[in-house]
Amino acid sequence: MSNTQSVTAVAKYIRMSPHKIRRVLDQIRGRSYQEALMILEFLPYDAGGPIWQVIHSAAANAKHNSGLDKKKLIIDKVFADEGPKLKRIRPRAQGRAYKILKPTCHITVVMKAID
């Protein structure tokens, strides 16, 4: 059994649909830390911003808490869970109202060091 350390970072209540976040997460899963940051920098999706922050935070956790080198980190697991929906009302004609649901999500990144 290998003795690899893993570090985790979580961003909660991101005001974006988990479906849109997962589209970007699939591009970086299994890649190295630096390669993932380069991919996120050039993707045309808004979801790249919050994901970039979480990956950066996980790398900082690895360096500060576990003393791991950022260059040796790879993204082991990354996923987006559904968060609570913000409920809003849009006024419509003749006194009616439509419900608007604004989705949120939680992004989790688990990185491990390779030897």
UniProtKB/Swiss-Prot annotation:
<keyword id="KW-0150">Chloroplast</keyword>
<protein>
    <recommendedName>
        <fullName>Large ribosomal subunit protein uL22c</fullName>
    </recommendedName>
</protein>
<dbReference type="InterPro" id="IPR036394">
    <property type="entry name" value="Ribosomal_uL22_sf"/>
</dbReference>
<comment type="similarity">
    <text>Belongs to the universal ribosomal protein uL22 family.</text>
</comment>
<dbReference type="InterPro" id="IPR018260">
    <property type="entry name" value="Ribosomal_uL22_CS"/>
</dbReference>
<dbReference type="GO" id="GO:0003735">
    <property type="term" value="F:structural constituent of ribosome"/>
</dbReference>
<keyword id="KW-0694">RNA-binding</keyword>
<keyword id="KW-0699">rRNA-binding</keyword>
<dbReference type="GO" id="GO:0015934">
    <property type="term" value="C:large ribosomal subunit"/>
</dbReference>
<keyword id="KW-0689">Ribosomal protein</keyword>
<dbReference type="GO" id="GO:0009507">
    <property type="term" value="C:chloroplast"/>
</dbReference>
<dbReference type="GO" id="GO:0006412">
    <property type="term" value="P:translation"/>
</dbReference>
<dbReference type="InterPro" id="IPR005727">
    <property type="entry name" value="Ribosomal_uL22_bac/chlpt-type"/>
</dbReference>
<dbReference type="GO" id="GO:0019843">
    <property type="term" value="F:rRNA binding"/>
</dbReference>
<comment type="function">
    <text>This protein binds specifically to 23S rRNA.</text>
</comment>
<keyword id="KW-0934">Plastid</keyword>
<comment type="subunit">
    <text>Part of the 50S ribosomal subunit.</text>
</comment>
<dbReference type="InterPro" id="IPR001063">
    <property type="entry name" value="Ribosomal_uL22"/>
</dbReference>
<dbReference type="InterPro" id="IPR047867">
    <property type="entry name" value="Ribosomal_uL22_bac/org-type"/>
</dbReference>
<dbReference type="Pfam" id="PF00237">
    <property type="entry name" value="Ribosomal_L22"/>
</dbReference>
<keyword id="KW-0687">Ribonucleoprotein</keyword>
<comment type="function">
    <text>The globular domain of the protein is located near the polypeptide exit tunnel on the outside of the subunit, while an extended beta-hairpin is found that lines the wall of the exit tunnel in the center of the 70S ribosome.</text>
</comment>
